Amino acid sequence: MKMFAYRGKHENFGDELNHWLWERLLPGFFDEDESQLFLGIGSILYDNFDPNMQKIVFGSGYGGYTNPPKVDGNWTFYFVRGKKTAEVLGIDPSYAIGDSGILTRSCWDAKSIEKRYPVSFMPHYESAMYGSWDKVCELAGIHYIDPRWPVEKVLTEISASHKVVSEAMHGCIISDALRVPWRAIRPIAPGNRAKWYDWASALDLEIDFDPIGPSNVVEAGASLVRNNTYLLKNITFRHRRIRQLTGNYVFGSTVKTLQRVAEKPGQLSSDESMVNAHNRMLLELDRLKQDFSKKTASVL
């Protein structure tokens, strides 16, 4: 069985978490046999997988990046990210347990890490690339967490924070799993909000999104031409040059907005919802191991 995980040109905490988490929970479980594909963390339930390949779904979500996949006998579901995913796929809502990143609770002791930061901010990885959020955080007096850092460094910085403000969905998901209060920054593109609501639905959680402006001229320009692919590519391709020409100028209004958001109380799903979701995932993890140990034994 091969593990499938999205990997772009730049590392991204939510996607890299797959490689970190599953090698700890399922050591020696995966190989390069693509006849069976393991789908874990992420909005990776696409419609373009080989229809003859067996897809094993373990906490993934539907993100709307393709049409919904046609579910047939080659799809096996242990659980999915949320109620919307279950609805779109036409499977029983009882499969909606939560994002499998919650299983980080089984591999990481956040309580053993000393709290050092009153508030930390984690942008979306594209915002980290094109924006100047490290400078915004410096001016706002808020600790900066880069989603492109190695997984364990991000986990350490989240654990060392009293509160996390995050534009990155897995910044909030993992903060919630580790019981670190968080606030969510509203995604600029409305289409990116559905996956947040999907995750929250499994935990009976209402997300109180905060809007925030662009950090610099690159992000402001990209926001204005978001629907024009040609112009958007031109701006993002030249982002370093634009920042150089503008002296890496950041918008003071965004600094103030981030400070205001940081002063608000953090959110958390209920302890009961989190413990229940985690325990159900552990049961499914045991079932997965049993199911495939039996199949391996039958082949031998």
Swiss-Prot record:
It comes from the Bacteria. Coiled coil: none annotated. Keywords: Exopolysaccharide synthesis, Pyruvate, Transferase. The keyword 4Fe-4S does not apply. GO terms for biological process: polysaccharide biosynthetic process. Its EC number is 2.5.1.98. It catalyses: [4)-beta-D-GlcA-(1->4)-2-O-Ac-beta-D-GlcA-(1->4)-beta-D-Glc-(1->4)-[3-O-(CH3CH(OH)CH2C(O))-(R)-4,6-CH3(COO(-))C-beta-D-Gal-(1->3)-beta-D-Glc-(1->4)-beta-D-Glc-(1->4)-beta-D-Glc-(1->6)]-2-O-Ac-alpha-DGlc-(1->](n) + n phosphoenolpyruvate = [4)-beta-D-GlcA-(1->4)-2-O-Ac-beta-D-GlcA-(1->4)-beta-D-Glc-(1->4)-[3-O-(CH3CH(OH)CH2C(O))-(R)-4,6-CH3(COO(-))C-beta-D-Gal-(1->3)-(S)-4,6-CH3(COO(-))C-beta-D-Glc-(1->4)-beta-D-Glc-(1->4)-beta-D-Glc-(1->6)]-2-O-Ac-alpha-DGlc-(1->](n) + n phosphate. One of its GO terms (molecular function) is transferase activity. The keyword Phosphoprotein does not apply. Disruption phenotype: Mutants form aberrant non-nitrogen-fixing nodules on peas. Pathway: Exopolysaccharide biosynthesis. It holds the Pfam family PS_pyruv_trans. Belongs to the polysaccharide pyruvyl transferase family. Catalyzes the pyruvylation of subterminal glucose in the exopolysaccharide (EPS) repeating unit. This is Exopolysaccharide glucosyl ketal-pyruvate-transferase.
